[in-house]
Structure formats: C-alpha cells, structure tokens
C-alpha cells in the first residue's frame, strides 16, 4: 500500500528568485509527500553539488536537468519500492548517481526525492513528519538562533562576519522564544533607524546596516536586548557565524571592514576574546574550512565554554565529522540537508555527533522556500537548536510557525531546550 507509484518533479523559485527543485512523491494508497530544496550563497568546497543547467536560461541557474533526473532515472530506479524503506531508497539513489558528491544526478534532485519520500510515508502512516522520523521520543523544541544582523556574503555592507544571532535561552517554550526574538528584532530596527542606518533586510531577514566591526554590531544587539526588557546572558545569549572561509586569503584572515589581517592564531584569539567580552555561547565557522590547525587552536582556547560549530568544516558529512572528532576539533556540527543530499545521511551525521557528545544545529540555507521540513527534523532529532533566519520574510517564518504548531501538537510532552544548550 505504500509503494512509490509516481514522482513529479518541477522547477520552482526560491526566496532569492532563483530556480530550485520541488518534488511530489505519490504512493499506492494515494498518499503524497512534497519537498522543496534550498540552496546556499556561501557554500563549502566539500558540499554535495546542486546540478545547474548553465546557458542563458535563468542566467545559467535553471534546474531542468535535475528535474528530468528525478522524473525519469530516479523514478525508474525506486518506483515500486515501499516508501517506508528510506535507507534502501537513499542508498539506491547514491549508487545510481555514482559520484562522491552527487554531481551527476544533482544533490538537489536526490534530496528532493529523499525528503518527499519520507513525507509521503509519514502521511501514509498518519503521523506528523517529526514523529514518523524521530519516533516516540521526539519532543524537544529547539532554541532558535535568530540572525538579526547580516554581513559577509549575505549583505552589501562592510561587516566581515556573516551572521549575528540572538538565542532566547530564557524562554519557557518555542512560542515564547519567537515572541522574545520578535520584540528584540523590532527594537533593533528602531535603534538602527534612530541612528540613521538602513533597515532593509537581507537574504535571511536580518538587517544589513553599514557597521564596520563585530563589536559595533554586538553592541547594537546588546542595547536592543536591554531596551526590549531582557537581560543579555540570562534571557538572551548571542551567537556568531563568521563564515571565515569567505575572507581567508593566502593563509590569513583578511578583515576588510575592520582594516586588519590576522594570522590563524591571532584570529582564534580574537574570537575567544569576543566570547569572553559578550554573552556569546556559539561561534560557527570561526576558522576556515581547511584550516584544521586554526580550528584546533580555537577549540583549545574557547571550546570548554563556547559551542564551536562546523559548517563549511564538516558540510553535514559524517566522514569529515569523524575526522574532526578524532582531532579534537570543534564541538558541534551544523546540519544542512542539501549539503549531503539525503535524509539518511543527514540523520547519520546527527547521530555521529551525538555519540561523540558533539551538539547538532539544524539549519536552513540563505536561498529558502516555504517548505518547513527542517522544523520537523529539528524536533525529530532532538538536536535542541535550529538556525532558520530572522523574524521577517515568510520563507523564514514558515519554519518558526511550524515549530509553534508542533509544540501545540505535542501538548504537555513538549520540552523547550532553553538553557540546556549552554556549555560550561
């Protein structure tokens, strides 16, 4: 009754107006699952490859080849298989592609099918996706890491670091966390406007003011937290995504906005100093993706008290994560479903992290859609943290709204991760 009977993939647009892949998977009993695939602006060199068409259409960014792969070759390989056999289906697609980075069929085609299969199977079983994937123990609502000031590749301003985030650890529920975040977001808007800064929002819904340094951005956020009636370090903590690979040139970190260039050791010391001076509990991609020595230095300096998240470093890849664990590098992994390309491999990365006492953070991409699958996956994996942008843009809010619905559905079972995510 839950055998796959049809796959219909199509080209739709993401939040940046670029094409992406959406897939519908139909089952014998009439159940249907739909998934849309996100894409990133700052991408790690070791990520799975999203297949783009090239040529003039959509300035080379069309995804008709990936759509065709899903509709024909992938369907021919998995049609008739029971959708509940997720691992088997994902492995068939990996083998069918035959490349180490899914570049032949495209990670965008493979992931769209993988997630749609899971959603169809969940519908057939009469369960919400988080319960179908995570089982009876899936009840932990994640602390949202809300990106309210953007820099780097996500904004046209001088700030070197890509994201400055607030984490409402003092909330009692996800609904309260979203309210607290919204209040700080709108307070920050007023503060920026009052000092003559632009309050347009970037790809992920955060502001992109013409500030020059990380401390300047952090000071604005600290003041806004207090003006909104909250206590920094108690009600609200801070997080950074440095995206350091973007400004790592010739073995050095070139902070153009701050007008200085740092050696690897000095960069690690700078980040440790920021974490000591502000209530920063999480730093993502503090060092460049292949600067393993720099990562080790940063981990030794700040890893006991600060969550050090590998995004470009690990690219949701269990093999790279195991390398990091063996070397004592970082202590957390960012989980982006399209970095690895199947649900099975995504869950494996989270499990690998948890077994090594590393944390995992479920994450969106800068190019998103209204698809809210990652909200369910955050709860399914009990990972306790989610990055899904700011408190504006419906492509970001779709995930927050889904978390609110999940919390309501769980009722008294629901637990909010809150301060349990803080290290040290």
UniProtKB/Swiss-Prot annotation:
Cellular localisation: Cytoplasm; Secreted; Cell surface
Named in its record, the pathway it takes part in is: Carbohydrate degradation; glycolysis; pyruvate from D-glyceraldehyde 3-phosphate: step 4/5
Positions annotated to bind (2R)-2-phosphoglycerate: 162, 336, 365-366, 387
Alphabetical keyword list: Cytoplasm, Glycolysis, Lyase, Magnesium, Metal-binding, Secreted
List the GO biological process terms.
glycolytic process
Question: Mostly located where?
Answer: cytoplasm
**Catalytic-site annotation from UniProt:** 204 (proton donor), 336 (proton acceptor)
The record's GO CC annotations read: cell surface; extracellular region; phosphopyruvate hydratase complex
One of the record's GO molecular function terms:
phosphopyruvate hydratase activity
* Keyword Lyase on entry: yes
User: How, per the record, is the cofactor bound?
Assistant: Binds a second Mg(2+) ion via substrate during catalysis.
Q: Report whether Secreted shows up as a keyword of the record.
A: yes
Q: Which residues bind Mg(2+)?
A: 241, 284, 311
Give the HAMAP family listed for this entry: Enolase (MF_00318)
Function, as annotated: Catalyzes the reversible conversion of 2-phosphoglycerate (2-PG) into phosphoenolpyruvate (PEP). It is essential for the degradation of carbohydrates via glycolysis.
Describe the family membership recorded for this protein in Swiss-Prot or TrEMBL. Belongs to the enolase family.
Protein name in the entry: Enolase
- What is the native source organism of this protein? Rhizobium johnstonii (strain DSM 114642 / LMG 32736 / 3841) (Rhizobium leguminosarum bv. viciae)
């Amino acid at each position: 009754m839950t055998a796959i009977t049809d796959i219909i993939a199509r080209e739709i647009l993401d939040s940046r107006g670029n094409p992406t892949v959406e897939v519908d998977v139909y089952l014998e009993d009439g159940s249907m699952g739909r998934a849309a695939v996100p894409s990133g602006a700052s991408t790690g060199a070791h990520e799975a490859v999203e297949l783009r068409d090239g040529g003039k259409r959509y300035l080379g960014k069309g995804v008709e080849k990936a759509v065709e792969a899903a509709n024909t070759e992938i369907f021919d390989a998995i049609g008739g298989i029971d959708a509940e056999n997720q691992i088997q289906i994902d492995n068939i697609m990996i083998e069918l592609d035959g490349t180490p980075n899914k570049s032949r069929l495209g990670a965008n085609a493979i992931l769209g099918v993988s997630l749609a299969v899971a959603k169809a199977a969940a519908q057939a079983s009469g369960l919400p996706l988080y319960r179908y994937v995570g089982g009876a123990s899936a009840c932990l609502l994640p602390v949202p890491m809300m990106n309210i000031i953007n820099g780097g590749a996500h904004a046209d301003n001088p700030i070197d670091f890509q994201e400055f985030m607030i984490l409402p650890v003092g909330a009692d529920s996800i609904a309260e966390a979203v309210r607290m975040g919204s209040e700080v977001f709108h307070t920050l808007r007023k503060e920026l406007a009052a000092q003559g800064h632009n309050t347009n929002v970037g790809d992920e819904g955060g502001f992109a003011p013409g500030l020059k340094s990380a401390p300047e951005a952090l000071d604005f956020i600290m003041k806004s937290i207090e003006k909104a009636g909250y206590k920094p370090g108690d009600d609200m903590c801070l997080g950074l995504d440095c995206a350091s690979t973007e400004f790592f040139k010739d073995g050095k970190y070139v902070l153009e906005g701050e007008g200085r260039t740092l050696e690897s050791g000095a960069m690690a010391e700078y980040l440790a100093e920021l974490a000591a001076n502000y209530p920063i509990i999480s730093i993502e991609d503090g060092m460049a993706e292949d600067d393993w020595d720099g990562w080790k230095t940063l981990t030794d300096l700040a890893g006991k008290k600060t969550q050090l998240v590998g995004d470009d470093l690990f690219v949701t890849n269990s093999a790279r994560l195991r390398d990091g664990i063996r070397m004592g590098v970082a202590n957390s992994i960012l989980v982006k479903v399209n970095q690895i390309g199947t649900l099975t491999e995504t869950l494996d990365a989270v499990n690998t992290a948890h077994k090594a006492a590393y944390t995992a953070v479920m994450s969106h991409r800068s190019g998103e859609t209204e698809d809210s699958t990652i909200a369910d996956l955050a709860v399914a994996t009990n990972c306790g943290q989610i990055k899904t942008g700011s408190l504006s843009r419906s492509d970001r809010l779709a995930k927050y709204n889904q978390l609110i619905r999940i919390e309501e559905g769980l009722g008294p079972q629901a637990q909010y991760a809150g301060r349990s995510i803080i290290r040290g």
